[in-house]
Amino acid sequence: MLLVGAVAVALATHRPPEALGQDAPPDVFSAARARQHLTWLAQSPRPVGSTRLIEVRRELLSLLAAMRVPAEVQTAEVLRLQGSAGTVLAATVHNIVAHLPGTEGRHAVLVSGHYDSVPSGPGAADDGSAVASMLEALRALRTGPPLKQDVIFLFTDAEEAGLLGAEGFRQHPLFSKVVLALNFEARGTRGPSLLFETTGPQGWLIQRFQETAPHPMGNSLAGEVYPYLGADTDLSIFGRAGVAGMNFAFIEGLIHYHTWLDSPEQLADGSLQHHGENLLTLTRALAAGDAPPRESPGRVYFNPVGAWLVSYPRAWALPLSVLLLVLEVLGTVGGARAGRLRLRGLALAVAGTVSGALAAAVLVTLAWNVTQNATGLDAFAQGDSHSPAPFQAGLLALVFVPFALLRRWGRNRIQDEEWGHGARLPWAVLAVVLTVLCPGASYLFAWPLLLALLIPYALRRGGDTPWKVGLVLTLGGVPLLLLITSTLYPLSSALGLSLAGVSLLLASLVLGLLHPALAWLVQGRWNTVAVGASAVGAVFLLSGAVAAGPRADRPWPESLAYWLDRDGKRAFWLAHEDTHGAWAAQFLGEAPPAKRFDEAMPWLETDVLYHEASLLPLPSARTRRVADDREGDVRTLTLQVDSPPGTAVLRFNLPPLEFLEVRVGQTPLPEAVLTAGRAEGVRIDYWQPPREGLPLTLKVRGEAPVRMRSSTISLNIPTLTESQRRPPSLMAAPFGFGFSDVTVITQTEAL
């Protein structure tokens, strides 16, 4: 029971603080007061350039004026290279910049959150939680005296369109004063607000966070992994410009991310409180001090349990891991010399530990894939479920199956002490390798290994009576389980059910560390454990599947798009390959074929379902030739592209020619884009093009005609009757995980 209790305590304490009500003191953050802003902010989606976003901008400016906070709207035309190919994202952005001058004002602390949302949801958490927290923090700051340094509250536009608002703020005169940035995001609707990324002097920032935040939660593993996930936030822009910063987000409730369920009702009060608490306390502390150093020794940091944050210099990580490996090797050698270990038994134990962990990962992945395919849960692009707990419990139970079967197989081949060393040796080697490659993640292996090493030592010192052995094994396992659960739970939340095999592979290795305690508890009944774990896993997975069906309060996503190809005089209904059900069938038929549609969806690198559709009389972009000049072999085309009302994105695809200059509006494309475009062509996505038309200038060398394919993308599906609309149990697929509820019209012109 103590071991189960340790897991329960770790899970129960991994939560945000209690939300404060309206009666909280005026100088502190109150989630109840912040929530009042969400009721009007997250009424409906507010994608970049939309009428709803314009309304929100006006309301924000009105609130800031009522608080007597100096604010302005920064309007800037922004072009940003996406990735390394010739793809450019562009928009005219409207950032809201609120500036609180400091008493000295030698530098500025920047607090940022984006006030736009995805088209597929009202964005209460992403990123209404940041906007509401910023407004409540501003109110609290105005109750006290001015701070020492300037504070800039930046409400960015067009974050969901590709961080364009943050890129635009780099053009603002105030940006030169910014030395510190705090950015607030959400990848779910609940859970603690975690520090998941830093830029600049990491060690100095972690120490400030540890000293200042009332409930500091986060870990350096996230900071090591995040840069490789291909995800970016506004802090990415500021960090690349040399600004020191901290990035915060809550990540539980992933299934709501970028969907209609990212609503005020789903947003947890505790998450909002934690967000705002971090924002207000860190802003006060950082704006009261001096500028951060340019460099600072890195630190490893993590929460062993709850909001207890431990940090230490990163330089300690490798010596600690090497020391633990040496201790384990010495223990192994000592056991062999004393006759307690046999080389063959040890080799089998190591092989069993590694193969058991791999088998557990494969079993869990297969079980989830079968469950997804059988229930239709593969429709959730986030790789999760509305009720993940039964699935998480079922998959965790399955981890015990290969673990128990291997112990049953090794009953007459491998001794318990050999199993113990067979688990700790590969863990110790992994600890050293991980520390070399990824020092911020070293705590994940080092500290559990230290606790695991103490168990056999305590056994040899504690006597051999059954009650003493049980006490030592149980008490040794409690801190190990506390630490591991506190570490693996946020990792599993970040990865989702689709990648549960990764986190549960580690869980299987942890079972190996706990072998002495588990062997004492099981007393050789490993067959019973395997059968019981299989049954428990099946029951939980089945119960989760039965309860997972679409309902009005838990809708499932189904994608649908309409593509009109004017060149080929054809039209298609398009949908994700995992789309199924009666609603989609009325457009796609019962068994639609699948293929790639790069002309319509160039960002997708997969097949989509399709079915022929009627050619609708929809307006498309119109390109007017303003000027066409030639000097030698260089041709300069000046164009004006008019897009129909309701166009969310105007896309240009230029062929692979030797472009010397491409100018969108008044802004030239970077040379890197032109260089890439000479081989691959150039793609420009301009969000919310101006109503008066978008100027486009092309300077190209050579005689070949410029065949430009233009596309208009609107955020709707044309001519749906009331009976054809989605039922309440369905919703649009999440933005950013493919496509949904868009109309694409393409045409090619020879210029």
Label every model-predicted segment.
Residues L323-A621:
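Alpha-helical transmembrane segments of integral membrane proteins
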Residues K177-L195, A317-R340:
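C-terminal domain-closing interface element
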Residues R58-T87, A91-H99, V131-A132, E211, ...:
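Extracytosolic and intramembrane catalytic regions of membrane-associated proteins
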Residues N303-L323, G383-F391:
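Juxtamembrane/start-of-transmembrane alpha-helix segments at the extracytoplasmic/lumenal side
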Residues P17-Y312, T667, A676-G702:
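Soluble extramembrane regions of membrane proteins in the secretory/endomembrane system
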Residues T13-S30, P550-L560:
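Ser/Thr/Pro/Gly-rich low-complexity linker/stalk segments immediately outside membranes or between
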Residues A10-H14, P293-R299, V370-T375:
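Peri-membrane helix termini and adjoining interfacial loops of integral membrane proteins
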Residues M1-G21, T528-S543:
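Hydrophobic alpha-helical transmembrane signal-anchor segments
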